[in-house]
Amino acid sequence: MAYTITSQCISCKLCSSVCPTGAIKIAENGQHWIDSELCTNCVDTVYTVPQCKAGCPTCDGCVKVPSDYWEGWFANYNRVIAKLTKKQDYWERWFNCYSQKFSEQLQKHQGEILGV
């Protein structure tokens, strides 16, 4: 088996619906896994890429299993470092939005107090 379902899987079941061989199974606990007896990695089919990988909305839910330990280690390391160093502006956007709303409310209440 060249592909596996990772912990990044969001259980959307899209991979199981696009798998041409029905190799993606769902365990009793809801966790997805790939049956290596059924998986053909979409080789010798009309598809040019494995459909589980192509259909995954998370991009990391279905990944290729590296043949070499260190290849897998560095692939995981590079993926994690890229995620950690990516600029995340969530809190900046949150602050800008709510500080503006707070400022508007404060001015409104100050106007009411001074007008009374």
Curated annotation (Swiss-Prot):
Cited InterPro entries? 4Fe4S_Fe-S-bd, 4Fe4S_Fe_S_CS
GO molecular function annotation: 4 iron, 4 sulfur cluster binding; metal ion binding
Pfam families named in the record: Fer4
Looking at the record, the residues that make up the 4Fe-4S ferredoxin-type domain are 2-29
Which gene carries the instructions for this protein? Answer: fdxN
SUPFAM superfamilies found in the cross-reference section: 4Fe-4S ferredoxins (SSF54862)
Q: Which organism is it from?
A: Nostoc sp. (strain PCC 7120 / SAG 25.82 / UTEX 2576)
Key words, A-Z? 4Fe-4S, Electron transport, Iron, Iron-sulfur, Metal-binding, Nitrogen fixation, Transport
Binding of iron-sulfur cluster occurs at C9, C12, C15, C19
Among the GO biological process terms of this entry, one is:
nitrogen fixation
* Gene3D superfamilies listed in its UniProt record: 3.30.70.20
State if Magnesium is listed as a keyword. no
Q: Which domain of life is it from?
A: Bacteria
The protein, known as: Ferredoxin-like protein in nif region
